[in-house]
């Protein structure tokens, strides 16, 4: 197991890529590598490492590894204790792969049961049945990639439920399994059509995705989920500083309030329906978010 803080991981890409290429070549000639798959753990991650400002806020390694062939270079975003434990259980049953695992170092609520975690890892993603509102008829799907992103999506979902806005919530732990396969090996790892349809139900016309990474990468990688739908993607937009997690979410436009604002745009809902006057002033840059959007209960994630 290799463990590093996420920003330093960018320096490790060159060597990791050579191992991926060699393992891929072995697989293609029918002599797959027999070494036990290696977890490359990226923690003290982009959204929680405010000690050294923007220099230590960089999701580049996960992005680069996701660009490599997904049957050898597997990139996962475990969201809590159970999904992280299940990730390691499944990882050590494979050979010849590098698993890049983006994992928070801070305490995260247990969001998935053990059974849900197995389903999540087996399929690469899951629709969260206990979240959302009137999901079967919802016109919009909220999709999170990354633990802190899921927490903000769930906050937005709670407000949407209060306002009677139908929606469903899903989590993708392994985005590479939802891409258009670029080779035969990747095609073997793509998740089933049933999972695709469960995450974006037939009634869904819009998708709001929030990613740990820069949003552009996921927009390209997850093309099959967007087909025939309007989509808005949020994620890291190179803004940072000596901020806590909620502060990072806010400056990068990934807070629950920013998510809710984009949902309103997609569904043509007036902001006055979902926001208070104070919240709208914050989103318009006229007030500090503290105590309104962030740090509502004097708690930091």
Give, region by region, the residue ranges found by the protein language model.
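Glycine-rich phosphate/pyrophosphate-binding loops
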Residues: 1-16, 26-27, 33-34, 170-173, ...
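Active-site nucleophile and cofactor-binding loops and adjacent substrate-binding regions
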Residues: 4-13, 42-44, 76-79
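Loop/helix-junction capping segments adjacent to catalytic residues or to phosphate/diphosphate-binding pockets
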Residues: 9-13, 85, 150-151
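Alpha-helical scaffold elements adjacent to nucleotide-binding pockets in ATP/GTP-utilizing enzyme cores
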Residues: 15-22, 64, 90, 156
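Inter-helical turn/loop segments and adjacent helix faces that build the functional surface
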Residues: 29, 72-74
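Thiamine diphosphate
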Residues: 33-38, 43-63, 91-301
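Acidic, glycine-rich A-domain
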Residues: 57, 77, 83-87
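Hydrophobic, small-residue-rich alpha-helical packing segments that form membrane-like cores
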Residues: 67-68
């Amino acid at each position: 197991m290799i463990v590093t803080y996420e920003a330093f991981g960018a320096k490790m890409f060159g060597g990791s890529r050579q191992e991926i290429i060699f393992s891929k070549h072995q697989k293609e000639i029918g002599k797959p590598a027999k070494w036990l798959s290696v977890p490359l753990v990226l923690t003290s991650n982009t959204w929680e490492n405010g000690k050294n400002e923007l220099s230590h806020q960089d999701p580049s390694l996960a992005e680069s590894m996701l660009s490599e062939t997904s049957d050898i270079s597997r990139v996962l975003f475990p969201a809590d204790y159970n999904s992280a434990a299940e990730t390691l259980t499944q990882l050590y049953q494979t050979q010849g792969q590098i698993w890049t695992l983006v994992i928070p170092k801070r305490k995260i609520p247990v969001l998935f049961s053990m059974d849900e975690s197995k389903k999540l890892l087996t399929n690469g993603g899951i629709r969260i049945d206990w979240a959302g509102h009137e999901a079967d008829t919802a016109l919009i799907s909220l999709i999170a990639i990354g633990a802190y992103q899921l927490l903000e999506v769930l906050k937005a979902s709670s407000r949407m439920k209060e306002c009677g806005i139908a929606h469903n919530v899903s989590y993708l732990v392994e985005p590479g399994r939802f891409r258009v396969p670029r080779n035969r090996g990747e095609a073997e790892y793509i998740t089933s059509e049933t999972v695709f349809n469960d995450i974006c139900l037939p009634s869904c016309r819009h998708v709001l995705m929030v990613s740990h990474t820069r949003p552009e990468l996921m927009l390209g990688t997850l093309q099959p989920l967007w087909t025939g739908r309007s989509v808005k993607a949020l994620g890291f937009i190179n803004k940072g500083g000596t901020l806590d997690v909620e502060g990072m979410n806010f400056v990068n436009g990934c807070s629950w309030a920013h998510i809710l604002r984009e949902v309103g745009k997609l569904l043509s809902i007036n902001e006055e329906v979902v926001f208070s006057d104070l919240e709208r002033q914050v989103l318009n840059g006229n007030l500090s978010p503290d105590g309104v959007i962030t740090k509502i209960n004097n708690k930091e994630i």
